[in-house]
Design a protein with these regions (language model features):
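Generic structural signal for small/hydrophobic residues in well-ordered secondary structure
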Residues: 7-8, 43, 79, 104, ...
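Alpha-helix capping/helix-boundary segments
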Residues: 10-11, 39, 75, 117-118
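Active-site neighborhoods of divalent-metal-dependent phosphate/nucleic-acid chemistry enzymes
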Residues: 68-114
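Acidic, PIN/NYN-like endoribonuclease modules and their adjacent C-terminal/linker elements
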Residues: 1-2, 106-142
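A general structural signal for well-ordered alpha-helical segments in protein cores
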Residues: 40, 53-57, 76-79, 97
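Short, well-structured N-terminal submotif of metal-dependent ribonuclease cores
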Residues: 1-35, 47-64, 133-136
Length: 142
């Protein structure tokens, strides 16, 4: 079965009920969807700086409960190699994006993100953008 690594922006769309991301997760089953521990860290950071900490912290905890959280330790060699490659090419991307993206590559995930601009620079990455995707014959977008 195909495995999907959900980027932080997609998790936020899921939480907010935007772009039919929830429907897509339900269609493919949540057990086939994963999040990086970096995504979880970004969600917790967002909660911490929010004016509504309790709500956003609960949302981050919910994401951690319904999706398997993938540790980055096994993917750090891929991160280091890809960072050097991008640096030499003069096309670096933020480390958190690179950690999430290289986790997708080395873990054989399809990365689901709305951040195609940065993440498509990663070699051998497979990306889907569920914000732009078509489900049930209708173009998504709220």
């Amino acid at each position: 079965m195909t495995k999907y690594l959900l980027d932080t922006d997609i998790c936020i769309f899921f939480i907010r009920g935007k772009y039919k991301v929830r429907e897509k997760v339900y269609d493919i089953k949540s057990e086939n969807c994963f999040v990086s521990e970096i995504t979880l860290a970004e969600l917790k950071y967002g909660a911490e700086k929010s004016d509504n900490y309790e709500k956003h912290a609960a949302e981050a905890d919910y994401i951690a409960r319904i999706f398997t959280v993938v540790p980055i330790i096994e993917h750090l060699d891929q991160f280091a190699k890809e960072k050097v490659r991008l640096q030499r090419a003069g096309t670096l991307i933020p480390d958190f994006d690179l950690l999430i993206g290289t986790t997708a590559v080395s873990g054989n995930f399809i990365l689901v993100t709305n951040n195609e601009k940065h993440l498509s620079r990663i070699e051998n990455i497979h990306i889907e953008n569920w914000r732009k995707a078509r489900f049930n014959g209708f173009l998504n977008g709220k």
